[in-house]
Amino acid sequence: MNQNTQPTNNLKDKKITYNFNKLQKRLRRNVGNAIANFNMIEAGDKVMVCLSGGKDSYTLLDILLNLKLSAPINFDIVAVNLDQKQPGFPEHILPEYLASIGVEYKIVQENTYGIVKEKIPEGKTTCSLCSRLRRGILYRTATELGATKIALGHHRDDMLETLFLNMFYNGKLKSMPPKLISDDAKHIVIRPLAYCKEKDIEKYAEAKQFPIIPCNLCGSQPNLQRQVVKEMLQNWDRQYPGRIETMFSALQNVTPSHLCDTQLFNFKAVKHGEMINGIEGDIAFDKMDIPMTLNIQEEDEKQAYTQNGTIQFKAV
């Protein structure tokens, strides 16, 4: 019995290890490509990774630390958690975890929970105020630490959800930028997980057994608009495999001449007999071959580095 069971267990363990390595390589490649494409991290940067205790920020920190080991440039990482003084928040978990992996960290204690509860009526969503409070505190902390970049754990699915939220409720064609500058131009915010699927992050966090801390202030509130949009996208993904990838590709392939924003494209300049830069004429949906499904292939990770000190991971 034991002799027969041992080979089976070995094969199972090898398969688990293979799948994890494959997943980790994919996340490394996606994060590396995002860093390179948007010039997120440069030589000498001090990257402040905002750690909430959720799967996304744990994965972000872990992958960045992993990439740092083989990066051709020097940059520093400091993890920051904002303890918002939520009732029952396990204050010991993050310090213990961060100390165990040997990363520089800072725990910022601010009673934003009390402010939110005081200002927002019971039953109303707290996300907007909570987000503004957190943002201000994180900007201040970045200045105190001398951080040149602030890294957030938003991923591809978050960006698509924001796109639809803005279309449905704000009348804007606007998503989450992978890189932005604060209103006072003092802080640069980056989202290195911009190319990463939430499914991959969930699997990675489970495999790494991160000590996840659930959010009881905003993310668990019922009937949030974001949750409704998330479920809509998940349903689409089940019914039409590849649709999420196609929609995210659309965020990277914008044709202003085929939209209606006069600030993005000068429609008044369109004249008989003249072709202007940025115009695609009558090339529209009916002239294109639209694939019904995507052929998504996983590629081996290969590293390539530029001369300006920016990390690049080239997928071939």
Swiss-Prot record:
A GO term from the CC aspect: cytoplasm
Principal localization?
A: cytoplasm
Q: Which cofactor does it need?
A: Mg(2+); [4Fe-4S] cluster
Enumerate the residues binding [4Fe-4S] cluster. 127, 130, 218
Which example biological process does GO assign this protein? tRNA thio-modification
PP-loop motif (motif): residue ranges: 52-57
A Pfam family hit: ATP_bind_3
Named in its record, the pathway it takes part in is: tRNA modification
User: Tell me, what does this protein do in biology?
Assistant: Catalyzes the ATP-dependent 2-thiolation of cytidine in position 32 of tRNA, to form 2-thiocytidine (s(2)C32). The sulfur atoms are provided by the cysteine/cysteine desulfurase (IscS) system.
Q: What else is known?
A: The thiolation reaction likely consists of two steps: a first activation step by ATP to form an adenylated intermediate of the target base of tRNA, and a second nucleophilic substitution step of the sulfur (S) atom supplied by the hydrosulfide attached to the Fe-S cluster.
Name used for this protein in its record: tRNA-cytidine(32) 2-sulfurtransferase
* Species, as recorded: Haemophilus ducreyi (strain 35000HP / ATCC 700724)
